[in-house]
């Protein structure tokens, strides 16, 4: 499994990650210089989603020249910008869409467009084993956002965010065979610390501090072993059968354990974790996303 970073100048991990996503907003030949200076094994994704149609058309020769300098590139665009797909395909430039896939029809549509990657999102991701088999048979990479509790519902109402799709750092290895690229959702300034947390594969605190959209107070140390394995193959049957209650049991058990001071694994809160937790709870919008 590889990790993607949305490029920003201040990042301490931009050399370490497997994939850099750079924001391209207007025609500039500086893109060619940037990709030329990257190692061959680092994938460069050029995010053109905010470009106008004119900027895209004017930049096609730049994308082609960039591909000649660095073979491992891809274009990230919106489905509404698909007029340039023919040119990208003619020059064998990989591309994929920013829009997430959360139904079988959306997956079929994007695969039919010839994408190289797909973002699997919301409750559809509970079918990740079958989805990955279909995608990998067509040489399509599967991407997820592990750090956000996801649902396709526009209204949360009485829905339980603990039953939404997300992946804890401790469980990320379970997805190794099914997910190709992990990308972090949310403020760009937090990507470095999220990368560290997921590479370390541990989180010693409330899930709500780590997982965006998680409104349930549950300490990760009170989640029993085996829960993540069950969840990987559950297909979210609780939504349409009502038979599976494992997440409800985990929440009830966690509440009882916290009330009585019990934990499955006693991970002491050290100074490093306190610093990390503080970073996760701050906001920093003063970020330079420019790649030059």
Question: What is each model feature region?
Answer:
Residues 1-292:
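Active-site pocket-lining/capping segments in soluble small-molecule metabolic enzymes
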